[in-house]
Amino acid sequence: MPPPFPTATAAASTTSHLALLLLLSSSSVFFLYKSLRLRRNNPPSPPPGQGPAPTPTLLYASATGTSKALAAGLSRRLAEAGVTAHPADAAAFDPDDLPSLPLLLLVLPTHDGGAPPPAAAFLARWLEESAADFRAGAALLSGLRFAVFGVGSRAYGETFNAAARSFSRWLRALGAAEVVAVGEGDVDGGDLEVVFEEWCGRVVRVVKGEEIGEGHNGESDGFDELEEEESDDDDDEEEVDGGEVDMEDIAGKAPAARRRNGKVEGALSNGGENGVRDMVTPIIRTSLEKQGYKIIGSHSGVKICRWTKSQLRGRGGCYKHSFYGIESHRCMEATPSLACANKCVFCWRHHTNPVGKSWKWKMDDPLDIVNAAIDQHTKMVKQMKGVPGVKPERLAEGLSPRHCALSLVGEPIMYPEINVLIDELHRRHISTFLVTNAQFPDKIKTLKPITQLYVSVDAATKESLKAVDRPLFSDFWERFLDSLKSLHDKDQRTVYRLTLVKGWNAEEIDGYAKLLSLGQPDFIEIKGVTYCGSSATSKLTMENVPWHSDVKDFSEALALKSGGVYEVACEHAHSCCVLLAKVDKFKINGKWHTWIDYDRFHELVTSGKPFRSQDYMALTPSWAVYGAEEGGFDPDQSRYKKERRHGAAALKD
């Protein structure tokens, strides 16, 4: 029987409970007050179906008319729901508009061999190359939602609706969110309309806000997914170690070789003959081809530059157009050596190319390289036919290249027959812009006249050069200094190319000023580093990317340090790039002459007589001069501004 009165212990317990209840009640009142206040300051989003529906961009790529008809049907379904979406041919769509779109709906068939139909070929190339391009960034399309419906036939087996799946994979790799899973219609299965109607229903509900959508985005690894789809799961195979492949720090996962009946097959062969290896192994080839390279022979490559595409469309040229007067739409970007002696932290390729300190590979004929490079380049230019903005006359000019940037990737002067290759380019009246990484001074000395010869000056001290370039040579600093000195004896145009990386080398202006006396170059190009994504081999972030104003400040300070020998001559704001030029050579009567008279250069080369850089200079147009309101943008071109997303912040214009 319990006691008639509470004990002291029970009384204390009751008091504690009352205090706890009072505390909880006070807290509840406080949090309720805060919640009500937050709701007043931040009203909740309207429930599904009440908010404004995004305006979709509805594209079709039709081969026989089926996809076009389906897109029209989707348009009607959306109209019934109060949403306007007019079907448009993908052939007339500009991929540069993708980052600014809220919602993309795409209906397309699969063409021969699993490829997209011709009407979507340019859009497909743009997406595929952007997805593989480290510079684009995984957040390029982070503001885009999308859904894709494919039209095909299961009779074609594994290529059934392959094009639709590829578009989905590329879009997700660029950060876009897939709100409805890929719809796969079978024209021979008898249920195309049923499958399409079901897919349309989900799209309409998502657009109206009645359904959240699946939300798959770039967090999934699209390329791994592709490899899984293409893998062969035969039970009688086993993986073998791929360590015999001759490469260093290759980005990405190497495909495993297969063993059948005790023999290794496939990916590990490097195509070498008589003990001499090919530079480009199958793994390296696959990695570079994903990035849009066309591999030539066993060690060379060519790739169409985005500025070539830009000027073909009348949207402006690269900084070389502003500084030196090249026609960007007639410029071929190539290299006779994909190998390099450095592993720079800002490498655009994330070290997907081979490395080496000397030539140890099979060597291709220089004339074959030039022929193949021009052939591959013109094929890529031809693919621009029909792209919005490309004019026939520009396309015709682009099919006849007049400039070659030997700066694609790797170290071009490692190629033993570089002089023969240069002679052949000049014989065809193709000017040469060669970039070397300042590790082969003897080869610089033996180079024949180049239209313009660059040396990369990535740091001003031994310690920072080692950190930035990560060179293979132990005597890298001595090689670097000797390379700069080798420029001093060149009569043709020479350039120091500086890439500024905040936190790495942008604070070394006094050291850079001291290096000027070694090579006494005609020009100094100063460019902010291009953000190309982080990886296991590069930890650069957007914090390391300087603003254009930072580059300008650095350039002006370096010009002052030169004591009047150099002045700031030109700028290309879009590329975050500034040019310093020697005053006594290129500033005549107060006007800059940084442009090149290309016809005169070829006359001088053909003559075989000695000549100087002043012998083929030309007047710089006013719009390219430093401080002009155009910022280095050619007023004859049409300015087109893209929306860019690099995760942290967008660069100032």
Curated annotation (Swiss-Prot):
Broad class of enzyme this protein falls into? lyase
Its Enzyme Commission number? Answer: 4.1.3.44
Enzymatic reactions: N(1)-methylguanosine(37) in tRNA(Phe) + pyruvate + S-adenosyl-L-methionine = 4-demethylwyosine(37) in tRNA(Phe) + 5'-deoxyadenosine + L-methionine + CO2 + H2O
The segment(s) forming the Flavodoxin-like domain are: 56-204
Q: Which Gene3D superfamilies match?
A: 3.40.50.360, Aldolase class I
Question: Which of this chain's residues are annotated to bind FMN?
Answer: 62-66, 148-180
Query: Out of the domains of life, which is the source?
Result: Eukaryota
This protein's record includes keyword Iron-sulfur: yes
Which GO molecular function entries does the Swiss-Prot or TrEMBL record give?
4 iron, 4 sulfur cluster binding; FMN binding; metal ion binding; tRNA-4-demethylwyosine synthase activity
Q: Where is the composition biased (Acidic residues)?
A: 221-249
User: Which keywords belong to this entry?
Assistant: 4Fe-4S, Iron, Iron-sulfur, Lyase, Metal-binding, Nucleotide-binding, S-adenosyl-L-methionine, tRNA processing
Pathway(s) this gene product operates in, as recorded in its UniProt entry: tRNA modification; wybutosine-tRNA(Phe) biosynthesis
Note down the stretches annotated as region Disordered. Answer: 211-276, 630-653
Tell me which InterPro entries the record gives. Aldolase_TIM, Flavdoxin-like, Flavodoxin/NO_synth, Flavoprotein-like_sf, rSAM, tRNA_wybutosine-synth, tRNA_wybutosine-synthase
Matching PROSITE patterns: FLAVODOXIN_LIKE, RADICAL_SAM
Please list the residues that bind [4Fe-4S] cluster.
C340, C344, C347
- Cofactor requirement: [4Fe-4S] cluster
Q: Which residues form the Radical SAM core domain?
A: 324-567
- Is S-adenosyl-L-methionine among this UniProt entry's keywords? yes
Question: What task does this protein carry out?
Answer: Probable component of the wybutosine biosynthesis pathway. Wybutosine is a hyper modified guanosine with a tricyclic base found at the 3'-position adjacent to the anticodon of eukaryotic phenylalanine tRNA. Catalyzes the condensation of N-methylguanine with 2 carbon atoms from pyruvate to form the tricyclic 4-demethylwyosine, an intermediate in wybutosine biosynthesis.
Q: Which family does it belong to?
A: Belongs to the TYW1 family.
The name on file for this protein is: S-adenosyl-L-methionine-dependent tRNA 4-demethylwyosine synthase
Q: Which organism is it from?
A: Oryza sativa subsp. japonica
Annotated gene: TYW1
